[in-house]
């Protein structure tokens, strides 16, 4: 998104706000389309194997993105962004469902908090690194190399994930993404505590995404700043999320 905001907008002759929102939409769209299907796959197959498979696909996607960066093929970068959104959609249920299998009930809240904190800090580190790379000579080459390197490191790390038994190996997967999504929503609605918890969580991310998507343009057009201003504002959000995650165990008293 930083590349689209500070480099691609002028070359493509498009408004920064349009590019920002288009990029955000392409990344989020797979969550709406494939989340229910991803949950079924996470229940049917062993999670460490699935993680390694997804991380291999991530390397392929990052190679595609690197090609788009180096040759400045911006439509290809949009395709890679959609594919990374799809990657995150299928990886999400795996990583969040792994903890209940690996942790006891008393450990779960704290583990979830640490998990979310780690995610926030990783995002923060990535944003800071992106800002540094954008200031270097030939930034697109650096970005290409770093993204592929990080994807490879992610795959290597996935090889150390302990094997866990698949919860529902006999599950028959319904590949109709619209039917499965509707059925999932209907089932959640019958469980008020789950329904309202998910609504609250979804509202938080909806509210955050609405504002965070506008940060690059706000920094560039209103504050007249560069990438460092964007990173500072996004850092505040990430740090807040990380601190809140740490407080989860204390606030909930493991309930």
Predicted regions and their residues:
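Helix-loop junctions on the cytosolic side of multi-pass membrane transporters
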Residues: 97, 101-102, 144-173, 254
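Juxtamembrane intracellular "pre-TM" segments in multi-pass secondary transporters
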Residues: 163-199
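Helix-loop boundary and gating motifs at the non-cytosolic
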Residues: 1-29, 190-237
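C-terminal ends and interior cores of transmembrane alpha-helices
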Residues: 56-72
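Hydrophobic core of transmembrane alpha-helices in multi-pass small-molecule transporters
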Residues: 61, 74-90, 202-203
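Helix-to-loop junctions at the C-terminal end of transmembrane segments
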Residues: 32-46, 134, 243-255
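Cytoplasmic helix-loop-helix junction between adjacent transmembrane helices
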Residues: 80-121
